[in-house]
Structures are given as structure tokens and as C-alpha cells.
UniProtKB/Swiss-Prot annotation:
<dbReference type="GO" id="GO:1904659">
    <property type="term" value="P:D-glucose transmembrane transport"/>
</dbReference>
<dbReference type="GO" id="GO:0042910">
    <property type="term" value="F:xenobiotic transmembrane transporter activity"/>
</dbReference>
<comment type="similarity">
    <text>Belongs to the major facilitator superfamily. Sugar transporter (TC 2.A.1.1) family. Glucose transporter subfamily.</text>
</comment>
<feature type="transmembrane region" description="Helical; Name=1">
    <location>
        <begin position="12"/>
        <end position="33"/>
    </location>
</feature>
<dbReference type="InterPro" id="IPR020846">
    <property type="entry name" value="MFS_dom"/>
</dbReference>
<comment type="function">
    <text>Facilitative glucose transporter, which is responsible for constitutive or basal glucose uptake. Has a very broad substrate specificity; can transport a wide range of aldoses including both pentoses and hexoses. Most important energy carrier of the brain: present at the blood-brain barrier and assures the energy-independent, facilitative transport of glucose into the brain. In association with BSG and NXNL1, promotes retinal cone survival by increasing glucose uptake into photoreceptors. Required for mesendoderm differentiation.</text>
</comment>
<dbReference type="GO" id="GO:0001917">
    <property type="term" value="C:photoreceptor inner segment"/>
</dbReference>
<keyword id="KW-1023">Dystonia</keyword>
<dbReference type="GO" id="GO:0015911">
    <property type="term" value="P:long-chain fatty acid import across plasma membrane"/>
</dbReference>
<feature type="transmembrane region" description="Helical; Name=6">
    <location>
        <begin position="186"/>
        <end position="206"/>
    </location>
</feature>
<feature type="binding site">
    <location>
        <position position="282"/>
    </location>
    <ligand>
        <name>cytochalasin B</name>
    </ligand>
</feature>
<feature type="site" description="Not glycosylated">
    <location>
        <position position="411"/>
    </location>
</feature>
<feature type="topological domain" description="Cytoplasmic">
    <location>
        <begin position="329"/>
        <end position="334"/>
    </location>
</feature>
<dbReference type="GO" id="GO:0021987">
    <property type="term" value="P:cerebral cortex development"/>
</dbReference>
<keyword id="KW-1003">Cell membrane</keyword>
<dbReference type="GO" id="GO:0042149">
    <property type="term" value="P:cellular response to glucose starvation"/>
</dbReference>
<feature type="topological domain" description="Extracellular">
    <location>
        <begin position="113"/>
        <end position="120"/>
    </location>
</feature>
Length: 492
């Protein structure tokens, strides 16, 4: 591997930084709706009274609020499934740039919903920003993976998740009643998303297009070479160009890859299964359930302002994403994912014990707080960041957009299902709901151990070749045989 491949140049930092502004938007819009729930519900009631001369029924209010929250995921499902329509036609960078129009429209709708006395404007704004975020979850990991050198691909790929958790943390802080989570400023809280959108519109024109897109999709070798020189900070980019040309030759031998082809072809069936299961391991891990439980647990523990403790968990969230950023290229993706899943399973068991004994032993609430922080920390070590960028690593240039669309759709759909069903399952199971997540985490651990290869330090073509060599027979190999061509046996 060339020394230049480990260099973090200014142009590379600008490109990745410009892209992850979209990740920040995703995180912010995920977390922003929770804090101002009561004041927005009051706005819904006032609007209803203004229109119909009577207070809104509690059931209608609950339905409207649930729709306001869930419509974001519906938009995300549609957006994530549409990734391939844009990236191959307009390019990776230009697609990110164009999508900011959705953020501006959403900001206007939500920002003026109170003035217009229209909760429909708010709900439509949530849907539109959901579409934007669904597209972002495909665009950002793809672009970052394609501009990054092999030696830095995992670390820079983790920045997508870091952007998400920082966005959530900002939303939690801005959502405090003393800042913007009050009856006067909540429209600004929801519409402030125009600022990162505007910033991205300013930054992205100075960022290069993906060199892989230029060479492999557009056959513009000179432009790709020029971009690579700027990204790598060196005049000698022969190694990168040769790798891309080899991938391009391989792509020309393959027919156009559709979403159905991903599941039909033996060469793609294994990696798409891995991609989907890793996305499910993120959303079905119970992380959303933990955040759901956290406020009530902090209250039972005697925390005077549970919202500040929730922000504390957001800080833990961010801190351990940074830890993952620094160790992912040393420890490897597979190892960190396994550690994260195992740690989360242990914390889920602790949480179940603590919640079950909370009434008899009040001090158990402190154990549950430790379990919450531990659960969040282990999530950000593996299942949080890794599923996002490993999907881009598992596929060559041809099938990558379709694969990212399928993986993103799986993530958003499972997110939607958990959001809609968790409260009913929790009412049925009580504190024992975490037993369900423990079982799922163990199953995901087993799958990861036997099926997921290590991609650390390997080029896209080497990873794809590993799957092609195995073909349909890979599932019959031992973990050692499966991981060998992909470098899992290399020294940490």
C-alpha cells in the first residue's frame, strides 16, 4: 500500500466534511421532534379549536402526533429506495447538492406552520425532510467510501454516524425549554435545518465528484486522475487508477445490476444478505427502546431534571462514536461489530434484572442507568456506525447503488416497525421487553461471526472478488476459509 494512501489531505477533509453535513441533518431531524411534544400538541389543539370551535379529542391528538413522528420514517423509506435514481444520473456530489432543495422546502413548511395555523404543513414538512434523510443515508456513505483511500475508509466512514449522533445531541440541547423547545420558538427549532442545508450548498461546489463515478460510470479518466491527485495530495495515483480500471473491466463483464438481480445472482446473494442483516442489527438492537425508557428510569433514580440525563446519554453516544472512529482501522469492522453486539446483550440482561427488581430494590435504578450508558456505548462501538459504511465496501461500483438502496430501505422499514410496535410490545412484556432484544442481539452475533467477512485494508475489487470466488458455495465454508481471501487473518 502506498504511503500517500494514508494521508489526510485538506481536499479530502473538505469533501468528507461537506458530505456529513447531510448526516448531521439526519440526526437532528431524528431527535428534534421529541422534546417539544407538549407544546406542539398544544398548537394542534389550538388549531383545532380555531377551525372547529371545540377542543381536539385525545384519540385524534394521539393519532396526529403519531403521524407527525412516523411520517418521517415513511419519507425515509421512499428516499432510501430512490438513491440509485439519482447517483448514477447526476453523480454523487451533485445528488447531495440537489437534495438540499427538499430541506429548504421542509424548513419553510415547518417554520410557518404556526403562523399559517396548519398542522398539515408541519406533517408534510416532516415527510419531505424524511425523504431528504432517506436519500442522505445512501448518498453520504457512498460518496465518503468512494473518495476515501483504502487505509482511511473505515475511519472516514464512521464520520457519517458521528454526524448523526452530533445532530441528535444538538437537537436535544436546542430542544430544552430554556432554549427553543418552548411555545414561542418551536417553529424555529424545527426550521433551523435550513442553516446546514445552506452551508452544504456553499461547501459542496468546492468538493470534487467521486473519482470512481467519473472513471467507471462516465469514463472520464483525465478528470478522475485530476481529482485523485487533489484528494491524495500526490502526483502519483497510478495504484488507485489501476484498481478502478480493474473494477471497471469487471463491471463491463457484468450485466446491469437491478435490485432483483442482487437476490437472484449467487455472486451478490451473500453480500446483500449481509448488508440487510447488519442494517437490521442496528435497528432491532433495542437502541430506540433504551432511549424510550431512559427518561422514566432517570426519574425513578431521583434525577431532578431527567432531560439533562438524557442529554448525558447523548454525550456518551457521541464520545464512543469518536472511539470507534479511531479504532476501526486497527481492530477491524467485524471485530468491533461483534464486541458491540456482545456488550449490548450483556447490558440488556442487566437492564432487565434492574427494571424487574426496581419496585423491591430502589437502588436498582442506578444499575439501570449504568446499563443504559453501557448499552449506548457498545452500540456506538459497532452496530451504530459499521452497518452504514460496510455496505458500500461489500459491493463493486455496478451493484453498489442498488445495494445501498436495499440496505437503506431495510434500515428505515425496521426503524418504522420498531417505532410503531414497541409501545404495544412494551405494554405486553413490561421490563422483560429487553429479553426480546437480548435474543435478537445473540442471533445477530452468531450471524456476524459466521457470515460477515473483514473488509479492513481491502480494496473494493478485492472484497467483491472474495465473494465471486466463493459464489453460491460460500455458505458451506468455515469462518476461517470465508474470511481468508478478505483479509480477516491479517494482524491487528
Amino acid at each position: 500500500m502506498e504511503p500517500s494512501s494514508k494521508k489526510l489531505t485538506g481536499r479530502l477533509m473538505l469533501a468528507v466534511g461537506g458530505a456529513v453535513l447531510g448526516s448531521l441533518q439526519f440526526g437532528y431531524n431524528t431527535g428534534v421532534i421529541n422534546a417539544p411534544q407538549k407544546v406542539i400538541e398544544e398548537f394542534y389543539n389550538q388549531t383545532w379549536v380555531h377551525r372547529y370551535g371545540e377542543s381536539i379529542l385525545p384519540t385524534t391528538l394521539t393519532t396526529l402526533w403519531s403521524l407527525s413522528v412516523a411520517i418521517f420514517s415513511v419519507g425515509g423509506m421512499i428516499g432510501s429506495f430512490s438513491v440509485g435514481l439519482f447517483v448514477n444520473r447526476f453523480g454523487r456530489r451533485n445528488s447531495m447538492l440537489m437534495m438540499n432543495l427538499l430541506a429548504f422546502v421542509s424548513a419553510v413548511l415547518m417554520g410557518f406552520s404556526k403562523l399559517g395555523k396548519s398542522f398539515e404543513m408541519l406533517i408534510l414538512g416532516r415527510f419531505i425532510i424524511g425523504v431528504y434523510c432517506g436519500l442522505t443515508t445512501g448518498f453520504v456513505p457512498m460518496y465518503v467510501g468512494e473518495v476515501s483511500p483504502t487505509a482511511l475508509r473505515g475511519a472516514l466512514g464512521t464520520l457519517h454516524q458521528l454526524g448523526i449522533v452530533v445532530g441528535i445531541l444538538i437537537a436535544q440541547v436546542f430542544g430544552l425549554d430554556s432554549i427553543m423547545g418552548n411555545k414561542d420558538l418551536w417553529p424555529l427549532l424545527l426550521s433551523i435545518i435550513f442553516i446546514p442545508a445552506l452551508l452544504q450548498c456553499i461547501v459542496l461546489p468546492f468538493c470534487p465528484e467521486s473519482p470512481r463515478f467519473l472513471l467507471i460510470n462516465r469514463n472520464e479518466e483525465n478528470r478522475a486522475k485530476s481529482v485523485l491527485k487533489k484528494l491524495r495530495g500526490t502526483a502519483d495515483v497510478t495504484h488507485d487508477l489501476q484498481e478502478m480500471k480493474e473494477e471497471s473491466r469487471q463491471m463491463m463483464r457484468e450485466k446491469k445490476v437491478t435490485i432483483l438481480e442482487l437476490f437472484r445472482s449467487p455472486a451478490y446473494r451473500q453480500p446483500i444478505l449481509i448488508a440487510v442483516v447488519l442494517q437490521l442489527s442496528q435497528q432491532l438492537s433495542g437502541i430506540n427502546a433504551v432511549f424510550y425508557y431512559s427518561t422514566s428510569i432517570f426519574e425513578k433514580a431521583g434525577v431532578q431534571q431527567p432531560v439533562y440525563a438524557t442529554i448525558g446519554s447523548g454525550i456518551v453516544n457521541t464520545a464512543f462514536t469518536v472511539v470507534s472512529l479511531f479504532v476501526v482501522e486497527r481492530a477491524g469492522r467485524r471485530t468491533l461489530h461483534l464486541i458491540g453486539l456482545a456488550g449490548m446483550a450483556g447490558c440488556a440482561i442487566l437492564m432487565t434484572i434492574a427494571l424487574a427488581l426496581l419496585e423491591q430494590l430502589p437502588w436498582m435504578s442506578y444499575l439501570s442507568i449504568v446499563a443504559i450508558f453501557g448499552f449506548v456505548a457498545f452500540f456506538e462501538v459497532g452496530p451504530g456506525p459499521i452497518p452504514w459504511f460496510i455496505v458500500a465496501e461489500l459491493f463493486s461500483q455496478g451493484p453498489r447503488p442498488a445495494a445501498i438502496a436495499v440496505a437503506g430501505f431495510s434500515n428505515w422499514t425496521s426503524n418504522f416497525i420498531v417505532g410503531m410496535c414497541f409501545q404495544y410490545v412494551e405494554q405486553l412484556c413490561g421490563p422483560y421487553v429487553f429479553i426480546i432484544f437480548t435474543v435478537l442481539l445473540v442471533l445477530f452475533f452468531i450471524f456476524t461471526y459466521f457470515k460477515v467477512p473483514e473488509t479492513k485494508g481491502r480494496t473494493f475489487d478485492e472484497i467483491a472478488s472474495g465473494f465471486r470466488q466463493g459464489g453460491a458455495s460460500q455458505s458451506d465454508k468455515t469462518p476461517e476459509e470465508l474470511f481468508h481471501p478478505l483479509g480477516a487473518d491479517s494482524q491487528v
